[in-house]
């Protein structure tokens, strides 16, 4: 199965995805028809926080919460502050164990209100070294530091592995500063 948000794609792209999924016997599902599913001991919840008719395709990101053994992981995709605001209005969000920081740590995501509500223990930022957008944004990093989130950035930490069975033990293939930013 592949879960997508249909409105995030042009009709030509949707047609191509449909043909490919049929060819390879993969079920293609719109996220608005799924909302959640279980896989073994894990449950996946898709939040309806899409911004209708937005010109910013990032606002069509699928935001997913994974729950496993009393741990909560929130995957933000490239969601914007507008998506975060909608999440805060529509849902009673819990505190999060692990946050995959939205939009590579861009200033268009990770609002103060959102970060203070979910209080992630660990924040993961995926951004390339010396990237042209100078990500992650320093204000986003300071916001996360302000709530004492342990920050791991792929620029310094490389591949990060978190053991969900072992009280969130973190291992990384560090390129530099192993403690995060």
Feature locations, PLM:
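Non-globular, low-confidence helical/coil segments that flank catalytic cores
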Residues: 1-181
